[in-house]
Structures are given as structure tokens and as C-alpha cells.
């Protein structure tokens, strides 16, 4: 038997907690036998004194086990259960292509995603733009679609990781969100509750990333890779670039359109393609579905080119309540804004740098993101044809096209976009889409 205040005192004094102490405290978070003040105090103690890797693994697994842990054995799946998670960015539509692509190569992808908050878009918000799509299906329907289609992308159910829900809301109100130990446990407890065989982790770097510096992003990526592998899930973390919008657009319906164009081959943004392939290939390798990276990429290109990945996206949409002909006729179903108009730079030159966070906030201002949890969204608004760094721009080449519902909203977004995309006389040096892979062998 432990006392919550003694556990707090121990961490306050900079000592390591045992896995039993951590389990006791997390159980108290779940059962409400630990008070909000005690949770806040432990959060602050961890923020200042950190946790070693054993403590992080213990915290992650205790939070994972605080609710239901999914079990796939009874379904008799004939392939690995694999997934990816992103720390979030702007124009990060990867999940919509990656899930069906991995499923088409023999994996099973039970992806539990989130909604957008702040400047980053949420995968669930994109699916909410599709009429009828259930982001909160029954567990029976979720399991059925995973088994029959190979991929289902839904929201977190109430019985998964209840400890994280309570802990996170208290951290949010007490300025302890930025602790890498606590971020690691929060992210991974939700993913590991899906009982995955393998996970590819996408940690963003740059002006639109969650972490402020490359060093902080790398520290988080290393922590996630070490803890996930330590908890028994094969995991690789990729450090990927978010110094510019990843897709050619940012929003909800506009990103769904880009995802379908990518899957059908109508248009594939080269940067988006590179990061999607990098993450998806890693999932296949970790899941034993490919012998090396070249083999993985060949398999992925095959399911893109033969239409199998697009077909599975359509089956997932219809399986979860959306239209059966969505892939073929998406323009009939996706909402469109009143005003669709280009924005031009005030000078000619090259797109030199981008405040990606500000572009994400421009989408929020248009109504496509939340200022606070629970806000209703306008799924039609956003940005399309966003220029890439190094693109030449002039009075006839727009830096973006704004989708807005009113002249006032357009004018506000136009100012924000012009301010966020900096034009230079020369093109900037090209940066890689993927900076680094952090595999178990690198830890």
C-alpha cells in the first residue's frame, strides 16, 4: 500500500519511482482516489525532475492498462497489426493514404486518431467532412471493418486509456504539457492500447511542429522509440519536416480531396509522397511484410498504381457509414465554400520561408479549426494550391487559394497568408523531407 503524497514527495526530491508506485498512482487517477491537486503536483514534479526510461515505460504501460486493451486474436487476422502516429502539423493528410496503402500490402491498421486543436489539423475532422462517416462506431463495427477491409480510422472510445484523459486535462490547466516524459506516455498509452505489432512514429520538426526546436523534436522521437520498444512494440520514429505545409492544402474537405487524388494518381504532391512512403515502408518492414526498403516501396507503388489502395479507402468509408461511391464521386459529397479565390504575393521572387503555424491558424480563423475543444467546424474552408518553398511567384502565380465563407473571412485570411509566406530574391536551400530514422538499433 502506497500513499499518493509520499510518491509525490519522492519525485519532488528527484528520486526514481518504482513501477509499483507508478501503477498505484495511475490506478488512483482512474478511480478518482487520487485528487486533482495530487495529480497536478506529480505532473509538476515530473516536469522539473523528469523520469528515467524505466519510469517512462512503467507510466506508459500503467496508463495503457487503465482501460480496455484491444485484442485482435479472436478475429484470426492473417497479417500484422500496424499503425502510425504523428505529432501533428499543417496539411498532414498522411493517415488517409497510409492506412489503405498498408492494408493493401497485407497489414491491419486499427487507427485511433484525434481532432485538431491549436494550429494543427485533426484526422477525425477530415473524416467528419464525409457525410455519414462514423468516427465513433461501436467496437463491433470497428473490429468488423478492420477485419473485412484491413483499415478503420476512428476516434478514441471512452473505455480506452481513461487515465490519460484525466491526467492530460489537468496538465493542460497546470502548465505541464511540455514534459517529454509525460508527452511520451500520453501518446504511446493510446497507441499501445490498440495492441499493435508495430508502430511508425512521425515526429515533426520546424515552424509548424509541436516541439519548438529540432533538438526537442529529436529528444521526443528518441524517447518514444525507446519507450515503445521497451514496452514490447516494434517502433521506429521518423523526424520529418514541417517548415512548410506538407500537402498542397490545409483544411478538412480540401485535404480529403487531396488524399483521394493521391490514391487514384490524379495528383501526388512530391513532398507528401516522400513522407507517406517513408512512414508506410517502415510499417511494412517492422510488420514483416517487406524484406527491405526497396521491396516495401515497390509493394506500396504497386497498390497505388493498381488502384487497390483507393479501393480499400472507399470500402472503409462505406463500411463506416459513408457513401458507397465516395472515391468516384467525392465532389458530389464534400462541402464547398462560398468564396474560392487566389492570393498573390506583393513582390515577385521565390517562396523563401514559411511560418507554418500561422498558416494553420489562418485555417482556424476561417472556421476550419478549433479555438477551444467542442467548437463546431466549417469543413469546407481552408487553403489549396499552397506554394512550396523554392517556388517562383509573381503577379500571375498565387501563393495560395483561400476557401472562405465571407468576404471578411477571406480578407483576414489573405493578410495572414501573405504575412506567413515570406518571399525572397533567391530560392532557399532545399531541406530533406525526412531528417532521420530512429530505430531500435539506434537506441
Swiss-Prot record:
SMART domains per record: PYNP_C
Keyword check for RNA-binding: no
Alphabetical list of Gene3D superfamilies matching this protein: Nucleoside phosphorylase/phosphoribosyltransferase catalytic domain (3.40.1030.10), Pyrimidine nucleoside phosphorylase-like, C-terminal domain (3.90.1170.30), Transferase, Pyrimidine Nucleoside Phosphorylase, Chain C (1.20.970.10)
GO terms for cellular component: cytosol
Keywords: Glycosyltransferase, Transferase
Source organism superkingdom: Bacteria
Alphabetized GO MF terms: 1,4-alpha-oligoglucan phosphorylase activity; thymidine phosphorylase activity
Reactions this protein catalyses: thymidine + phosphate = 2-deoxy-alpha-D-ribose 1-phosphate + thymine
Pfam families: Glycos_trans_3N, Glycos_transf_3, PYNP_C
EC number of the protein: 2.4.2.4
Keyword Magnesium: no
GO biological process: pyrimidine nucleobase metabolic process; thymidine metabolic process
Assembly notes: Homodimer.
Task of the protein: The enzymes which catalyze the reversible phosphorolysis of pyrimidine nucleosides are involved in the degradation of these compounds and in their utilization as carbon and energy sources, or in the rescue of pyrimidine bases for nucleotide synthesis.
Protein's recorded name: Thymidine phosphorylase
Encoding gene per record: deoA
